[in-house]
């Protein structure tokens, strides 16, 4: 079969890998100038390694991507440091990533520590999750952890992550995040871009046709009598394919496919998501040298973060990965999740840099703006799905109502959170589904 894959991110490349190995002809249509999607990197002229546009790491439990890494001969490039995760408490940076650190956390007494540890252990080791999706994370966490722990830890994180939707997110999503986390975090020699490049070359080596700067514009059934298949327009040209897999956002599928209608269309249009805005700073000095913090969760008290820190997380990458790979720069990400219509998507880089850099002295009183050697800004309007109550009923099927057309997006990996591991998983899952359907799809093509 001739198969088109819309999007050459991790999901698209993973699907292509399996489909090509099964003997099919695969064309990947990518609107960007490089493969990898949100896992792509960029490189300053001083650096040995490229850096992710949006911060990335793996957990030791990420079996899908680790399995693929092994298959393509890249396992020796994957390593797992043990960085420090901290929180801001009463204007101090406090490590908060192990039972010992929970005990010494100044906001908890011994009863709080026992309760926090017991509930967290339950979420970490329990497996059934469907009952949890009947409850919002806001209500469940408050009830089970108690008001004090909830207000100190979970509520600020939910607000920071989901903004105006924080009281809608179901508890199964939070369970999934806690269930798979590991203290050691995985990274690749050469960054995630090295993994993307390796997977891209494997796909090309199997015969995959990857077309960059070639955004998809329209997908429609071939309307000729007994023709079957799909007409895919990309880069101003229309080609016929036996099947197509869309690995971008559900909203883009709706725009690309005017023939999509009925319950499926209503289902994908009802899905909510948050965008991501990340400013990366190359600093002359470390911002969080005293605590050697990699990941700092910043408490948010309101969805608009008014009067507080204007982003969700500070990620000092070079407290995780040696800065010698980055020309001795200290790499700092300022990251936030915001609604797709948020002003951050229209503000200039200079405006956002003034806003973000203007609060960094709160985390290190010695910080001065002239520490910033260079900055970069990356934005994505579709980055974090918002799973509401009973979300499993709202997930679109991988098969769309249009024969031969499939959707494989981050909105369908629920209850798991978005990330490269689940991009690999859903990419390979949709490929196996398409292979299962191949007989009927090939039959239609033969009849034509």
Positions of PLM-derived features:
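N-terminal Rossmann-like FAD-binding beta1-loop-alpha1 element of flavoenzymes
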Residues: 1-28
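Short loop/edge segments at beta-strand edges and connector loops
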Residues: 7, 80-82, 212-214, 220, ...
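Conserved Rossmann-like nucleotide-cofactor binding loop
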Residues: 11, 34, 251
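Conserved flavin/dinucleotide-binding core of flavoenzymes
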Residues: 314-448
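Dinucleotide-binding Rossmann-like beta1-alpha1 core, especially the glycine-rich loop
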Residues: 46-131, 139, 143
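Glycine-rich FAD pyrophosphate-binding loop
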Residues: 20-45
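Active-site/ligand-binding neighborhood in enzyme catalytic cores
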Residues: 92, 104, 108, 117-229
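Mid-domain catalytic core of redox enzymes
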Residues: 22, 217-332, 337-346, 350, ...
């Amino acid at each position: 079969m001739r198969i088109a894959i819309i999007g050459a991110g991790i999901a698209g490349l993973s699907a292509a890998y399996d489909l090509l190995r099964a003997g099919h002809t695969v064309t990947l249509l990518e609107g960007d100038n490089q493969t990898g999607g949100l896992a792509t990197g960029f490189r300053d002229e001083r650096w040995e390694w490229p850096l992710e546009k949006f911060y990335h790491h793996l957990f030791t439990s990420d079996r899908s991507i680790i399995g693929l890494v092994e298959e393509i001969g890249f396992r020796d490039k994957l390593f797992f440091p043990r960085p420090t995760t901290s929180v801001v408490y009463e204007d101090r940076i406090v490590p908060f990533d192990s039972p010992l650190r929970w005990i010494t956390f100044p906001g908890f007494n011994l009863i709080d520590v026992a309760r926090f540890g017991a509930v967290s252990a339950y979420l970490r080791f329990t497996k059934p999750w469907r009952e949890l999706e009947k409850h919002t994370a806001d209500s469940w966490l408050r009830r089970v952890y108690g008001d004090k722990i909830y207000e100190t830890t979970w509520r600020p994180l939910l607000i920071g992550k989901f903004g105006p939707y924080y009281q809608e997110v179901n508890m199964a999503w939070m369970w999934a995040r806690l269930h798979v986390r590991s203290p050691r975090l995985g990274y690749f020699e050469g960054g995630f871009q090295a993994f993307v490049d390796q997977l891209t070359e494997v796909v090309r080596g199997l015969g995959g046709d990857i077309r960059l700067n070639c955004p998809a514009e329209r997908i429609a059934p071939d309307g000729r009598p007994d023709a079957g298949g799909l007409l895919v327009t990309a880069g101003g040209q229309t080609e016929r394919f036996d099947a197509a897999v869309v690995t971008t956002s559900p909203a883009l599928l709706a725009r690309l496919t005017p023939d999509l209608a009925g319950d499926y269309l209503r289902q994908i249009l009802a899905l909510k998501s948050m965008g991501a805005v990340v400013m990366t700073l190359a600093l002359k000095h470390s911002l969080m040298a005293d605590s050697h913090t990699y990941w700092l969760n910043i408490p948010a008290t309101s969805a608009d973060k008014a009067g507080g820190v204007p982003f969700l997380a500070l990620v000092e990458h070079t407290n995780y990965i040696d800065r010698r790979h980055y020309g001795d720069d200290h790499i700092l990400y300022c990251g936030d999740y915001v609604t797709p219509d948020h002003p951050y998507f229209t503000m200039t880089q200079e405006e956002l840099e003034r806003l973000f850099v203007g609060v960094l002295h709160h985390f290190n009183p010695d910080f001065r703006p002239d520490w910033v050697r260079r900055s970069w800004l990356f934005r994505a309007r579709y980055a974090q799905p918002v799973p509401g109550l009973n979300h499993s009923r709202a997930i679109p099927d991988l098969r769309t109502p249009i024969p031969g057309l499939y959707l494989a997006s981050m909105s369908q990996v629920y209850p798991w959170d978005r990330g490269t591991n689940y991009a690999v998983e859903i990419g390979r899952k949709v490929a196996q589904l398409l292979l299962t359907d191949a007989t009927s799809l090939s039959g239609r093509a033969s009849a034509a």
